[in-house]
């Protein structure tokens, strides 16, 4: 009964959060808001094609633990270790932070003290997703930025590449997300890359789910990893720069990269949805868009809560 009550309260939160936000929030205060973000992310994506994956990951690491409040952007100080310096966030690509800073700088010149960093992340994520072939979804605007960011508050809140699928399901359910929504959001691994340290320990072990030829290729790709920890492999080796449903097709063939990827196809609670999305890209796009929109509304601050940061990396 308690879990049902919690889910009801989460549903009520999402409904009321959406009702407080609007898609045209900046139409009068910053009419070029969308154009400025689109120009910024397009230029960045052209010069560095990994930007889309970097920002999508940044968005998840900001929103999932405690809500979409741009707390992951805040830099640490001598008195506080911020979220971005927690161990799980140290591998977040710099291009993700850079494009948000560029967008914020341009927006501050056009509309000072008006646009929140959390709104910038949400829109930039959606727009970058589109540049790599992903689906469109409406982004509701009016979020405010958090005044706090503490590494200690992230403990056990974000899934690791090695987290068992049962625990990942629990983590998502505790935030009000269903198993199907979790599987859909995992499709973000359709683009981007992972460092060898996140999976190389499992390669070559028995019963890990790797296609044998794929395991050999991964061993070869990561052979110099001890000397160069920056070596990485694409999450989707078939269409690494295109957002599509190939990720799910790969899982069925033993071509998943991370332990969490393999878990999606080994657990009967999630395998059904993997099969579904592997067969139907339109359905995957529809469900992914809905889940991303829902995630973008999670834990937001509005009204008098939070602030509009002048710089995304520092509290006013």
UniProtKB/Swiss-Prot annotation:
One of its GO terms (cellular component) is extracellular region. Transmembrane segments: none annotated. Substrate binds at residue 159. The active site is at residue 61. Heme b binds at residue 189. It catalyses: 2 a phenolic donor + H2O2 = 2 a phenolic radical donor + 2 H2O. Binds 1 heme b (iron(II)-protoporphyrin IX) group per subunit. Its cofactor is heme b; Ca(2+). Pfam families: peroxidase. Keywords: Calcium, Disulfide bond, Glycoprotein, Heme, Hydrogen peroxide, Iron, Metal-binding, Oxidoreductase, Peroxidase, Secreted, Signal. Residues 1-19 form the signal peptide. The keyword Signal applies. The record marks 57 as: Transition state stabilizer. There are 73 peroxidase genes in A.thaliana. Removal of H(2)O(2), oxidation of toxic reductants, biosynthesis and degradation of lignin, suberization, auxin catabolism, response to environmental stresses such as wounding, pathogen attack and oxidative stress. These functions might be dependent on each isozyme/isoform in each plant tissue. This is Peroxidase 31. It comes from Arabidopsis thaliana. The gene is PER31.
């Amino acid at each position: 009964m308690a879990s049902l009550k919690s889910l009801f309260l989460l549903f009520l939160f999402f409904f009321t959060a959406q009702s407080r936000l609007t898609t045209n929030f900046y139409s009068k205060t910053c009419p070029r808001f969308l154009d400025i973000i689109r120009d910024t992310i397009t230029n960045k994506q052209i010069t560095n094609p990994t930007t889309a994956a970097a920002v999508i990951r940044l968005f998840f690491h900001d929103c999932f633990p405690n809500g979409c409040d741009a707390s992951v952007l805040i830099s640490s100080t001598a008195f506080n270790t911020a979220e971005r310096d927690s161990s799980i966030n140290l591998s977040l690509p710099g291009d993700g932070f850079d494009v948000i800073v560029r967008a914020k700088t341009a927006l501050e010149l056009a509309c000072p003290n008006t646009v929140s960093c959390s709104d910038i992340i949400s829109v930039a994520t959606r727009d970058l997703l589109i540049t790599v072939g992903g689906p469109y979804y409406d982004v509701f605007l009016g979020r405010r930025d958090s005044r706090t960011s503490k590494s200690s508050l992230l403990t056990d809140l974000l899934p690791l590449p090695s987290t068992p699928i049962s625990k990942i399901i629990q983590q998502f359910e505790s935030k009000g997300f269903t198993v199907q929504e979790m599987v859909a959001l995992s499709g973000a691994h359709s683009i981007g890359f992972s460092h060898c340290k996140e999976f190389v320990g499992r390669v070559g072990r028995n019963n890990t789910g790797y296609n044998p030829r794929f395991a050999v290729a991964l061993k070869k790709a990561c052979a110099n990893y001890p000397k160069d920890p920056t070596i990485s492999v694409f999450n989707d080796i078939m269409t690494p720069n295109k957002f599509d449903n190939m990720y799910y097709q790969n899982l069925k063939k033993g071509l998943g990269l991370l332990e969490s990827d393999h878990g999606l196809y080994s657990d009967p609670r999630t395998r059904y949805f993997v099969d579904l999305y592997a067969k139907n890209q339109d359905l995957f796009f529809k469900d992914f868009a809905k889940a991303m929109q829902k995630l973008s509304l999670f834990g937001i601050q509005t009204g008098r809560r939070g602030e509009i940061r002048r710089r995304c990396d520092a509290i006013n």
